[in-house]
Each structure stands twice: as C-alpha cells, then as structure tokens.
Regions:
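Alpha-helical transmembrane segments of bacterial inner-membrane membrane proteins
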Residues: 1-245
C-alpha cells in the first residue's frame, strides 16, 4: 500500500515522477529541518489540500472510481490523463543536450516526456503568457511550464514535435504557465489541447483529499482495482515526522 506498492512496480514509479517528484522533494527538505517546521507547514496548508494520489488508473475505470471516492467524502478530486512520449524536435530540429546550458535538459531529451491535456486551465496553474486552448484548435497547440521555457529557450509560436506510441504530433506553443508544484495536485510541464491529444494512448492520474479514517475503504478500492497504486501523503508525512523525533 503506498510507496511500498510503487517500489514493486518500477514502471509506475517512473510514470509518476513528473507529477509528484517536486512535491515530495519539498517534503523531504522540510523533514530535514525537523518535525516542528513540518507540523507548522502542515497546519498552514488549506484544509482540503489533496492528500492522496492514484496512479495507473485506466480511462474506462475513472468514472467508477470517482463515484466511489465521492461516496467516501473525497474532496478536490482532480484527474488528468497521462501519456508517455518523447520530445523529437523543437522547431523542426532534433534537440541535443549539449545545446542547452541547463543540465536538466538532457533528461528530457534522452528520456521520456510525460504530458497531459485539459479543457480548462488546471488548478494550481497560472497563465502568464499567451492564451488557453480554444474550443476547437485548427492545429495542435501546447502549453508549457515556465521551467521548460527557460530550459529550452522557448517562446510563443515555437513548435514541439512529440512521439507517443506510434503517433507523432507537432504542436505550436500558445501559452506559458506557472505551476504551483507545492499544491499536491496532478501537474505537468507539458499540456496539449484535448482535441489533438485525446486519441493518444494514456492512463489517468488523480489527486484528492480524504479525511483520516478511511484506510479500510481505500484498501478495498485497491483490492477491487489491483492495477492502481495509491499514495497516502498523510501517512508519508507521519512517517517522516516520527523518524525525525
């Protein structure tokens, strides 16, 4: 249950890295300075801050799982599709790690790119340049996090070519976002317009807030959907705090 389950599924651990790594890095940094600051930080978070994540949810399961979570009293349920692909070109040119001073660029260029799509601007995202996706974009559009803009020297109007499974998509950057990675919501560096992306092979990531006392209910959910991996943030924080006392 939780991180132990993820550890047994290396591929799932890799899949969830983009959405959760920055949040959990922040947690670990807080843990280093001691449980007092950690407890203070927890009290300052909004009461309905997401404290659970579901990983590897299949599209055909999403509605039924959401209904069960709603029956348990889950709040702030946020789901986004997750596709795994590769960044093939920027403005028609194959990117090379040595062309960028930011060392993190190599990971994106040589590894996988995890992306999503959404009709509306997701929670914990703020539009800082450009416009959000139209109802029916004539050509594929992309929205990138500011980190990508800085790392790859991107600007509005640039094109990104992506390979996802057997599909290839070339999207024009129409907006730049600033993401609150400490929000404990499902977030992505790269979002595509839904009309262009919804046919891509994908799973679903979900975040939600559920009060304590539902461990048995969540265990039952995991048994009924054995492909799911559940991360209980409260349990992780408790263990971090206890380990530091």
């Amino acid at each position: 249950f939780g991180l132990a389950n993820l550890a047994r599924r290396r591929s799932l651990s890799l899949i969830q890295a983009t959405s959760l790594a920055l949040s959990f890095t922040a947690l670990m940094l807080l843990a280093i300075v001691g449980p007092g600051l950690l407890d203070t930080w927890r009290r300052e978070l909004p009461p309905d801050t997401p404290n659970h994540f579901l990983i590897n949810l299949q599209p055909e399961q999403a509605a039924a799982v959401a209904t069960r979570l709603d029956a348990l009293g889950a709040r702030q349920l946020n789901t986004l599709p997750l596709a795994v692909g590769k960044l093939l070109a920027i403005n028609g040119k194959t990117p090379r790690a040595e062309d960028f001073s930011d060392r993190r660029a190599a990971g994106w260029i040589n590894g996988e790119t995890r992306l999503s799509w959404s009709e509306a601007l997701p929670p914990a995202n703020r539009l800082v340049e450009g416009h959000w996706f139209g109802a029916a974009a004539a050509t594929p559009e992309a929205s990138v996090d500011r980190l990508w803009v800085d790392m790859f020297h991107l600007k509005l109007g640039d094109t990104l070519t992506l390979g996802v499974g057997e599909q290839r998509i070339e999207a024009r950057i129409t907006s730049v976002r600033e993401v609150d990675w400490s929000s404990f919501r499902v977030n992505f560096f790269l979002l595509l317009d839904p009309a262009s992306a919804r046919s891509l092979p994908h799973s679903v990531l979900a975040s939600f807030h559920l009060p304590r006392g539902h461990a048995a209910d969540l265990a039952a959910l995991s048994r009924d959907y054995p492909n799911l991996s559940l991360i209980d943030v409260d349990a992780i924080l408790d263990r971090v705090r206890d380990a530091r006392r």
